[in-house]
Amino acid sequence: VTQLYGDRMMIANATGCSSIWGASAPSIPYTCNHEGKGPSWANSLFEDNAEYGFGMYTAVKQIRNKIVDAMTELVSMDICEDAKAVFTEWLDSRNDGEASKVASAKVVELLEKPACDCTDEKAKELVKAIKDRKDYLVKRSQWILGGDGWAYDIGYGGLDHVLASGEDVNVLVFDTEVYSNT
């Protein structure tokens, strides 16, 4: 899974067996690519991992919504057409993992150079708001991992809530058939 989504993957892992075989020093399977980017991994209490992972997802979603608001306002302002095109491309592709990576690189490049010397104070404020959140431009792939004991018993209520939300999260249950918690 990390080979498919690694550089934009966020993992919430239920405490237990998978924490041991999936994140014990000195041999941790989560690595970085040539850009120094890789999955983020954190674990929570055994019983609340679904809620924990959902909270991670919701926090990122809120931050990205602030980026959307800033870019939407900038596009409606009197700024250079190049900037409008870059922001519009990101707005159109922000919910597609791979396309958002391409568009995000263009946004970061634009933000790093004084291409469109903004003199408008509101525009400067909005550009700063985007710069401050640039690590959230690429769409994250949120994963919630846990074992059969977690998913079918103590964590079921939270997991049911998360799945019923219809939000874009992924759940991987390690069904060992020996009720191995996580």
Question: Predicted segments — roles?
Answer:
Residues 10-20, 26, 62, 69-70, ...:
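Carboxylate/His-rich catalytic cores and anion/metal-binding grooves
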Residues 18-22, 31, 123, 130-182:
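Thiamine diphosphate
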Residues 45-122:
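N-terminal leader/propeptide and maturation segments of large enzyme subunits in energy/redox metabolism
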Residues 15, 19-46:
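Terminal amphipathic helices with adjacent charged low-complexity linkers/tails
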Residues 4-8:
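Long, compositionally biased charged/polar accessory segments in the mid-to-C-terminal portions
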